[in-house]
A protein has these predicted regions:
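Short beta-strand-to-coil "C-cap" segments at the C-terminal boundary of structured domains/repeats
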Residues: 147-150
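Loop/helix-junction capping segments adjacent to catalytic residues or to phosphate/diphosphate-binding pockets
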Residues: 74, 92, 123
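Conserved GNAT acetyl-CoA-binding A-motif
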Residues: 106-117
Length: 150
């Protein structure tokens, strides 16, 4: 099936919210999770440097990656916040393409690094990031801060 990759629009918000809940359920192994607070996703549609990238198949959003530009401190970096691919679509290279797009976006903004957090026990995600060249910058309780120089 063909996958279209693009920047999200406000019309994608419901699908992004659903994928976020699916991601939380996978990470925390429970159905009892809360989604984004009201207004959170809308901040990505204001025309600033923060964006959400989406993957779409047959008109449905099947993956997303939210990007936040951080220019305070040195070095400036792109932070990958939330990242989810629908369970039925995993293994198709969607995650790799979204990461590739994030790198392209960081370079276009002149940001030399990418940072993200991952849960220590999310071994699948940790393997994905390791294959993509991320290393551990800091251990922060149940999470690891990972980084990659571009």
């Amino acid at each position: 099936m063909d996958t279209v990759f693009r920047v999200a629009t406000a019309g994608d918000e419901a699908a992004i919210r659903q994928l976020f809940v699916e991601m939380l359920r996978t990470i925390f192994h429970t159905q009892e999770v809360e989604g984004y607070p009201a207004g959170y996703v809308g901040r990505f549609f204001t025309g600033g440097e923060d964006e959400i990238l989406v993957a779409e198949q047959a008109g449905a959003v099947v993956g997303f990656l939210s990007l936040e530009s951080h220019r305070e401190g040195e070095p400036p970096f792109l932070y990958l916040d939330d990242f989810s691919v629908a369970a039925a679509c995993r293994g198709q290279g969607i995650g790799f393409r979204l990461l590739d797009m994030a790198e392209e976006y960081a370079a276009a903004l002149g940001l030399g690094e990418i940072h993200l957090h991952v849960e220590r026990d999310n071994l699948g995600a940790r393997r994905l990031y390791q294959r993509w060249g991320f290393g551990v910058l800091a251990e922060q309780g149940a999470r690891l801060l990972l980084g990659k120089k571009l």
